[in-house]
Regions:
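Outer-membrane beta-barrel pore domains and translocons
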Residues: 36-42, 103-107, 136-138, 191-195, ...
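Transmembrane beta-strands of outer-membrane beta-barrel proteins
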Residues: 31-39, 98-102, 131-133, 186-190, ...
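Outer-membrane beta-barrel proteins
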Residues: 22-26, 87-95, 125-129, 175-181, ...
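Residues that define the transmembrane beta-barrel architecture of outer-membrane proteins
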Residues: 29, 78-85, 113-117, 167-171, ...
Length: 379
């Protein structure tokens, strides 16, 4: 089994797991640290393939994480695509009105290489109003903030039909207002900035394993509204930007022409007694480039002591400007989680990926049956 490429991740995680999160006070400043890890292994045990467009992958293949190039290939167990180790630290002033937060993540999908995911300053302007400046997670989806923290998620890997895009972070700033309106708790966030992603994992899946594509999102401007009351929660988001690509492996030295995109997202959640459910919907208008993207997710789960079964369905489809073949596929996922302690859990997940793309599609596609197990921990 090809576990060598994640050996560093496993070894470092094993050393750090026993350590609890901690805080240290020093000359009026408080330093805190914490971490998370996922040790996962999975295997594709059936499916279909189109040899002409496998893009250098040994398919049938299951894509668990588009943004990070998390791909399970046929023929053997793999530990890399979903395994990760993250460390987070922050320093805050004694009055709590100013803080600096950073987070780095080492991923098996990147052969253990660590990337800086967050590095931002927070200033509390009032009891309700907060401003943040630096590198942050782009709030595309409901689970965007926690998508690397396996323990915080009901899945081992989030449904890729929805949680799969070329950019997940941005450099910029946000202004957040939190308040309570009658019996409703809510927040409004306005944010903006830009992001340049070199050697995009997303585009390696589409352009080929040996390709290199750089991505740029500029003029990012978005608004997010979240509300909750009792058992119900809802979230809407709108993000606009310009997008550009540069296919470096083909010798391109400059980015393509800027194309405008507008992203719309809606999330609904319910948590009643032991039952919980979630619906999430995404619409991306990229008619300036190629067309439109649609994705949705429906999930229902049940808590029974330390056990938590979950069933979900996710669908993705395109509508193109021209007569090219649009991409269409969906996945059924069944997950069983067992909480070992208050900060650790094990999971087993079965995914059935059904490809509905018409013949003639030019990138990797096909059906896949995937089984994955994981151990998640926060510390």
């Amino acid at each position: 089994m090809p576990f060598r490429r994640t050996a560093f991740l496993f070894a470092l995680g094993a050393q750090l797991c026993p350590l609890p999160s901690h805080a240290v006070d020093l000359q009026g400043l408080e330093f805190t640290g914490s971490g998370f890890m996922t040790l996962a292994a999975g295997r594709v045990f059936g499916g279909t393939r189109d040899v002409a467009v496998d893009q250098g992958f040994h398919c049938p293949c299951f894509i668990s994480d588009y943004a990070q190039r998390g791909v399970y290939e046929a023929g053997h167990w793999q530990a890399g695509p979903d395994s990760k180790l993250g460390l987070q630290g922050s320093v805050s002033a004694a009055d709590g009105r100013f803080s600096l937060t950073g987070q780095a993540v080492s991923r098996g999908a990147a052969n253990g290489a660590a990337n800086l995911e967050w590095l931002y300053a927070t200033v509390e302007l009032s009891g309700n109003l907060t401003v943040q400046l630096g590198r942050k997670r782009l709030p595309l989806f409901s689970y965007s903030e926690a998508q690397d923290v396996g323990y915080a998620l009901p899945w081992i890997h989030l449904p890729p039909q929805l949680y799969g895009w070329e950019v997940v972070n941005y450099d910029g700033g946000s202004l957040v207002w939190r308040d309570q309106w009658a019996q409703w708790n809510g927040s409004v966030q306005v944010f903006g900035g830009s992001e340049t992603r070199k050697d995009s994992g997303f585009w390696r899946i589409y352009n080929g394993r040996s390709s290199r594509t750089d991505v740029r999102w500029s003029d990012i401007l978005g608004t997010e509204l979240s509300v909750s009351r009792d058992w119900f929660s809802a979230r809407v988001v709108r993000i606009q930007s310009h997008t550009q690509n540069k296919l470096v492996s083909l010798g391109e030295t400059s980015f393509s022409e800027r194309k405008r995109q507008v992203i719309h997202g809606l999330s609904l959640g319910a948590d009643v007694d032991n039952w919980f459910a979630r619906g999430e919907f995404l619409y991306i208008d990229r008619r300036d480039d190629y067309g439109k993207d649609y994705a949705n997710l429906l999930a229902i789960g049940y808590r029974h002591g330390p056990w938590q079964p979950l069933l979900s369905r996710a669908i993705y489809r395109q509508r193109l400007n021209n007569d090219s073949v649009p991409e269409r596929h969906g996945t059924w996922s069944a997950v069983l989680r067992y909480d070992l302690t208050d900060d650790s859990a094990i999971k087993a997940q079965l995914d059935l990926w059904k490809d509905r793309t018409a013949p003639g599609y030019g990138s990797m596609h096909g059906d896949a049956r995937q089984f994955t197990v994981s151990y998640d921990r926060v510390f």
